[in-house]
Each structure stands twice: as C-alpha cells, then as structure tokens.
C-alpha cells in the first residue's frame, strides 16, 4: 500500500545556512508520527515546506501526497489536497462566532448567498467529531484555550483534511484538556486521518505516537517505532548526548527565613464576591526552591502576583521580608525589596517582541547605566548585555536582533538575564519552561540550581508536576484558592501531590528549622 505522504530529500537554505539538509519523512493513512527536535532543529521549516508556506522552487527535494507530486505555491494549494496545519498560536478570529470561524474562507453559498441552514447542519456534525457542544453563535474569544484548539480541528475537518499537523497543541492546555485532545486525535486516526504531532512533552509523544521522527541541526537523525523508545532514547537523539539527569541533583543548603506571607486573601478583579486566594500563609528560606502545585484555578499565579505587586484586584494580608513587614503594591516596590519575577505568559508580559534582545535584557535595570545622570552610558550597557548573553547562553545572531525572532527557550533565558541584573534575593518563576525544548529546559534547571547555591530563594510554579517535584525542596499544594498542603520533598510522587490537592482537610508537614 503506497504511503499517504513522502517527503524525499528535502533541503531548504536561507543564504548560506541550511535550515534542513536532505531530510526525508513518510507516513501512512491513519498513522500518527511525532516530529521531535530542539527549537531551531528544523521542524517548523520542514512543515512550512510541506504546507506550501515555502513554495515549490524555494527548496530542493520532492513531496508526494496521495500518489501525486505536490508543487504548491501557497498554503491554499495544500489545503485543497487535504493537508492542514494548526499552529501553537491559534489562527482564529476571536471576535467572530464559532460557526463563522469554522467556515471562514469555505462558506456554503447558494446563488451567491450564504446558506446558514446548511452551514449549521454541517457545523453540528463537525463539532460532534471533536466532542464539542457549543452554540454556533458563541464568540470564539469567550472560549477557553482547550475549546479553541478543538474548534481549529473542526475547521480543518471542514476542509476534508487527510493529514493534520499539530504544532505544540497542548502548550497552554490543562491536563484534562490535553487528555480530551489526545482522545480526539486517536478517534480521527480510526477514520483514516494521519497526524504529524510536534511537542516537547515527551510523555504525550510516547502516549500518542505510532512512530517518532527526530531532527537535529536540520538533519534527520532517525525514525523509530514509538513502542520501542523510552523518553531517554528520544532525548539522546534530540540533543546528541545523554542527559544523565534532567533535574540537577546538586546539594544546596537552605538558610534563614527570608520571606513570610500571612493570611493572604485576593479577590477577583471584577467580582468582589469571588476569592481567588483564600487566607493562605507560608514562608521561604534563603537558598530554598519552593514549588507551588495545583490544578488550573488553584490560585498559584494569583498568589505570586500579589507578592510581586501586579495582581489587578484587591488583596489583603501581610508580607514580611527578613522579618520586617513590607508594603508591596506595584512591581517597582517588589523590585526594591529584592524580588524579581519571570511571568507566566512571556509573549504578553515578558518581552517587547519588536525590541532588540539586548534592550529587553536591560529594560528593568536602566538606572545601572545612567550614573546619576539622565544620559545612558551605552558602552556600559553594551558590555552588560554581552556578559548576560554569554552567562545565560542566549543563542542570538546579534544583541540587536528583535527578541520576537528568537526561540521560546532563548526568549526565556533573556527574561532570566533581565531578572538577574536586578540582583534579586527572591526569584519567582511562573511556568519557567512552558513551550521550550528539552535542551533549553536542562540549561534553565542548571541555572536555577546555581542560583540557590548562591543563596537566592526561588519560587517555582509549574503545571508540569514532574518539574515541580524534580526541582523543589518543598511543595505547596493549592486547590481552589486554598493552601491544602505544605510538603517536604522527600521523594514525593505525583499521586501524593494530587491526593493532597483533592483531599478535604489541610495537611502540613512540619519542617526542621
């Protein structure tokens, strides 16, 4: 039986740089292939070639789909063949309804007039295929990210898709939403729809894939049956070396208490009757990594936003630093107290995409380069930028390159570099490795370990429980705004953390002082 897709010896160059070099990929109808590789490995370039974003003639090699050679000059050409790609940044118009988004560019018309009755019937069938039950008149912007992802798939199904490409589809989804999405992909597989799945979450890759294809530095490293590969095997192929331990296990000593929060309560910014954080208290020691775990809506991000002075609603409670009560109502006051934060959404809150990498790094510490006068010392700033880029191993062709052009991992390193310029005593990391590759994760984990060895106290919030457990000395477990447990991390398991989150009573393990 012929393959549904064959990409043969694809090479794509940008100037003198080969982004992909003689890469081949093939898959059958109904097969799920995961495409793995670090950021910058060439995965996205290969998919852009496949989808016609890079048109025929701009690359070398051959693409055969359903027995015919594709020579696409535009993405619409491949869509007509039955190839659809869903990017991590969803391509939905949030002001339009769900129905309007699904049929956008593919409207059903009769004598030049849109036939809403036929579109509604088709809409109901499409949503049933992705297990959604939403009014066609619902505005897409009112949906959660998980539902928006499924609307994108329904939109692809409306184009008679035969090959669905999913690029980091679960980066912003909860575990429950991820589980629903994977079930739908498996169901589509039963109907003969093939899938190329791109993700840094190797547990998902293992769970969903028939085969796994690894690309490194633009070259095809290998394609193997998923059943015969461990996560360590995938990592070794991706990075070209064996990572003996993803989470550094170097000993570090905790010191005296540096932070204490007492009876913190935060209200919803609009509805004062809803408590997003409900009377929680905890402490943090110098050189300690404190993890905060919990399901979506637990109040984790709200808690640290209060600490950093950026929670948009009202809150009350007491914050003590070095035993002295402090008042923090904005980020400037937090920074003055030695607190720095890497935000949850780096694209929205962490970077200025069109600004240079270097300027993003020094953005919060410009006073370091003024020397008491209003004019910047450009030489001192440039020296600091180059040192920060080297220290954090930020991969950029130039400090003057717009930071929006860097990979997610390198953007995150630049944000960390900015935080370290503030000489923080307390560093808050909210989803520090979301959407970044395994190699960049490893480097960030090593950096965190180095910081606590210097006595910096670190708070880590992550939706990935293995990350929380792999990094933290102690774990706070939150659920629906309440602190449910304060657990010393002596080989804690994910099951113990989830049990603590969902049990009715509050549980605290006493710490040795």
From Swiss-Prot:
Compartments, record wording: Cell inner membrane
GO CC annotation terms, alphabetical: plasma membrane
UniProtKB keywords: ATP-binding, Cell inner membrane, Cell membrane, Membrane, Nucleotide-binding, Repeat, Sugar transport, Translocase, Transport
Stored InterPro entries: AAA+_ATPase (IPR003593), ABC_carbohydrate_import_ATPase (IPR050107), ABC_transporter-like_ATP-bd (IPR003439), ABC_transporter-like_CS (IPR017871), ABC_transptr_XylG (IPR013455), P-loop_NTPase (IPR027417)
Principal location: membrane
Keyword Protease recorded: no
Enzyme class: translocase
Enzyme Commission number(s) of this protein: 7.5.2.10
Family: Belongs to the ABC transporter superfamily. Xylose importer (TC 3.A.1.2.4) family.
Protein name: Xylose import ATP-binding protein XylG
Source species of the chain: Shigella flexneri serotype 5b (strain 8401)
Gene transcribed to yield this protein: xylG
């Amino acid at each position: 039986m012929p393959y549904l897709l064959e990409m043969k010896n694809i090479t794509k160059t940008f100037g003198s740089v080969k982004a992909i070099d003689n890469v081949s990929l093939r898959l059958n109808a109904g097969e799920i292939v995961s495409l793995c590789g670090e950021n910058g490995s060439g995965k996205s370039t290969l998919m852009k070639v496949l989808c016609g974003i890079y048109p025929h003639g701009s690359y070398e090699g051959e693409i055969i789909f359903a027995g015919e050679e594709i020579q696409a000059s535009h993405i619409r050409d491949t869509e007509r063949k039955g190839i659809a790609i869903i990017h991590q940044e969803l391509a939905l118009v949030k002001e339009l309804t769900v129905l309007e988004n699904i049929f956008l560019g593919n409207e059903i018309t009769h004598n030049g007039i849109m036939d809403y009755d036929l579109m509604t019937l088709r809409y109901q069938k499409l949503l049933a295929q992705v297990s959604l039950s939403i009014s066609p008149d619902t505005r897409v912007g009112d949906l959660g990210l998980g539902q928006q992802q499924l609307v994108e798939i329904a939109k692809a199904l409306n184009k008679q898709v035969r090959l669905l490409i999913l690029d980091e589809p679960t980066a912003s989804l909860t575990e429950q939403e991820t589980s629903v999405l994977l079930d739908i992909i498996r169901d589509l597989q039963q109907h003969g729809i093939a899938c190329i799945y791109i993700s840094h979450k190797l547990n998902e890759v293992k769970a969903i894939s028939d085969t796994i294809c690894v690309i490194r530095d633009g070259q095809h490293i290998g394609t193997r049956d998923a059943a015969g590969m461990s996560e360590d095997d995938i990592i070794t192929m991706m990075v070209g070396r064996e990572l003996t331990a993803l989470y550094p296990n170097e000993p570090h000593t905790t010191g005296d208490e540096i932070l204490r929060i007492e009876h913190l309560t935060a209200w919803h910014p609009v509805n004062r009757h809803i408590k997003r954080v409900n009377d929680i208290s905890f402490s943090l020691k110098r050189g300690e990594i404190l993890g905060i775990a919990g399901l979506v809506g637990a109040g984790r991000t709200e808690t640290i936003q209060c600490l950093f002075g950026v929670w948009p609603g009202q809150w009350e409670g007491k914050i003590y630093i070095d035993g002295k009560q402090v008042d923090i109502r904005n980020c400037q006051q937090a920074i003055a107290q030695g607190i720095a934060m890497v935000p949850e959404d780096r694209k929205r809150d962490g970077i200025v995409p069109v600004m240079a990498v270097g300027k993003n790094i020094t953005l919060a510490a410009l006073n370091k380069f003024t020397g008491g006068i209003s004019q910047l010392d450009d030489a001192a700033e440039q020296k600091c930028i180059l040192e920060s880029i080297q220290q954090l191993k930020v991969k950029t062709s130039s400090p003057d390159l717009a930071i929006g052009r860097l990979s997610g991992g390198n953007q995150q390193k630049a944000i960390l570099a900015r935080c370290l310029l503030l000489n923080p005593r307390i560093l808050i990391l909210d989803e520090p490795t979301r959407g970044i590759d395994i190699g960049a994760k490893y480097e960030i984990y090593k950096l965190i370990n180095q910081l606590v060895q210097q006595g910096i106290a670190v708070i880590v919030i992550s939706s990935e429980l293995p990350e929380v457990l792999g990094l933290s000395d102690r774990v706070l477990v939150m659920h629906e705004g309440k602190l449910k447990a304060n657990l010393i991390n002596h080989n804690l398991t994910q099951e113990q953390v989830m049990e603590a989150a969902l049990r009715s009573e509050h549980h605290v393990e006493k710490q040795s002082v």
